[in-house]
């Protein structure tokens, strides 16, 4: 909530713990989403909600800093969700290629499909390494942790969606049928590129830090 003057910017924002049943809070209808339906989404409205000063987190004016710090962890969380979905998609693809036959041969014996599986696994491994590095930077309080979290979120969520999408392609028409889990993985991972800051915003965060003297050298 803004506790400072209207023109105080980020320095005028403070964080508070608000009881979910506080007077003045209302909740909208459950949103009918394309994916991620295991996590309900509703609009939360605050209308003249009164909160005691004792409910403030930290000092006055620290709210924006808390929010930004939470975003870094949230970005690692979303990136990890993409890793899990991509891992499952890769396993399903391996199994399907070993079971399905065309022209008297298992699909796994076709080199073009082997190459696709190899690329999916390589991208997943690279993304997992980047996410672990970002988590380490955040735990260590590294000055460039936010940039690393943005890199991990951008790469892992783009990769996660692409791996799931490629897995669906490998399954052919079966991948598009709700009886199989791949269509859900594709729908669920699509929103990862939007949550906790869109991937376009991630690129902006990264680029701004890269233009800071010494940042690029620190990546070596």
Model-predicted segments: where are they?
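A short core secondary-structure module
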Residues: 1-27
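Active-site PLP-lysine loop of aminotransferase-like
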Residues: 3, 35-36, 75, 153
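Residues embedded in well-ordered secondary-structure elements
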Residues: 5, 33-35, 106
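Residue-level signal for secondary-structure boundary sites
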Residues: 7, 24-26, 52-55, 215
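Short glycine/proline-enriched turns and hinge-like loops at secondary-structure junctions
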Residues: 8-12, 37-39, 198
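Flexible, small-/acidic-enriched active-site or ligand-binding loops
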Residues: 21-52
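Alpha-helical interface subdomain recognition
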Residues: 43-48, 53, 59-64, 68-220
């Amino acid at each position: 909530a803004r506790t400072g003057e209207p023109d105080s910017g980020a320095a005028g924002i403070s964080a508070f713990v608000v009881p979910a049943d506080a007077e003045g809070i209302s909740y909208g209808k459950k949103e009918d989403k394309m994916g991620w339906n295991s996590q309900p989404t509703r609009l939360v409205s605050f209308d003249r909600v009164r909160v005691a000063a004792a409910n403030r987190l930290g000092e006055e004016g620290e709210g924006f800093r808390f929010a930004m710090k939470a975003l870094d962890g949230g970005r690692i969380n979303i990136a990890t969700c993409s890793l899990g979905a991509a891992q499952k998609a890769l396993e399903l693809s391996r199994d399907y290629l070993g079971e399905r036959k065309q022209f008297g041969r298992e699909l796994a014996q076709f080199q073009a499909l082997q190459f696709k599986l190899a690329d999916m696994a390589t991208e997943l491994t690279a993304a997992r390494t980047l996410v672990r590095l970002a988590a380490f930077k955040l735990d260590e309080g590294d000055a460039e942790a936010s940039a690393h979290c943005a890199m991990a979120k951008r790469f892992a969520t783009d990769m996660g969606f692409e791996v799931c999408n490629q897995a669906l392609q490998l399954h052919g028409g079966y991948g598009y049928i709700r009886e199989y889990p791949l269509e859900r993985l594709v729908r669920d991972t699509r929103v990862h590129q939007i949550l906790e800051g869109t991937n376009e915003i991630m690129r902006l965060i990264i680029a701004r830090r890269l233009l800071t003297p010494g940042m690029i050298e620190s990546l070596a």
